Amino acid sequence: SEIRSLFAVASRPEIVSLAGGMPNLSALPMEMMAGVVNELILTNGAEALQYGSGQGHPKLREQICDVMALEGIRANADDIVVTTGSQQALDLISRIFIDPGDVVLVEAPSYVGALGTFRQYEASVVHVEMDNDGLIPDSLRAAIKSVRAAGRKIKFLYLIPNYQNPTGVCLPADRRTEILAICREEEIFVVEDNPYGLLGFDKPSPNAMRAEDSENVIYLGSFSKTIASGLRIGWALVPQSLKDKLVIASESSILCPSNFTQLTISSYLADQPWRDQIASFCELYKV
């Protein structure tokens, strides 16, 4: 796949890659992380090294609610499913929703890893035009009309509203509201992929789209960019009606996300100045 090829090249020591979305961990204090892991093993190793819940550790899910609150989301921990990175969350959503030949609407251009996932489930990907402010609402209306006129079924709209991959565009608040209104009217779920929302340089990004619509938006989050990508922990915040389906799909795939990495992150969030650490990443990337 394209994403596998990117990471294969990026892993070569002589290459400085700008292609793979790999975070720069030079701002992450390794001694601090070593202390977190050491303390976890000494005080709670039996739980950390055991199987866990297919939905994710309850304490971490509560802490994820606090993280999402920074972007205006009021969430119930029971509606969160912890995954092995948000890429797995996207795979689970695709597995639940997509039948061969179904249409998924995406931005033009869009994240290559998402496109590969949709095509793996034999979806037909329809690109919707963007401009310098992101996805164009009128183009979304036109795409929906065209797809349905051809008798095809749209399963969801996938977009990255904050610092979009690969363009870096941040979707303005008024467009978010308009896009949500269109999708509600047309009864189309929105899959909001938001790994970069807390990494704004000069000003906070607008509130997450999920903050405005809890019934029609499936929100994907990740600690890959705000802590470390190697921990491989993300999550999906879903409408209550979808939660059990997502948990069952995840359990059938991986049984449960790693308790060790979940509790490492939970300890980090509980005991370390994680907001200051995110600010350090922002300053590093700004330079």
Residue positions per predicted region:
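N-terminal "arm"/small-domain region of PLP-dependent enzymes with the aminotransferase-like
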Residues: 1-54
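Conserved core of the PLP fold type I
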Residues: 42, 47-186, 191, 197-213, ...
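Glycine/Thr-rich phosphate-binding loops of Rossmann-like dinucleotide-binding domains
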Residues: 26-28, 90, 114, 167-168, ...
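Conserved core segment of the aminotransferase class I/II
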Residues: 211-213, 218-283
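Short, intrinsically disordered, charge-balanced linker/junction segments flanking boundaries
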Residues: 1, 280-287
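Short, solvent-exposed loop/turn segments at secondary-structure junctions
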Residues: 21-25, 87, 111, 162-164, ...
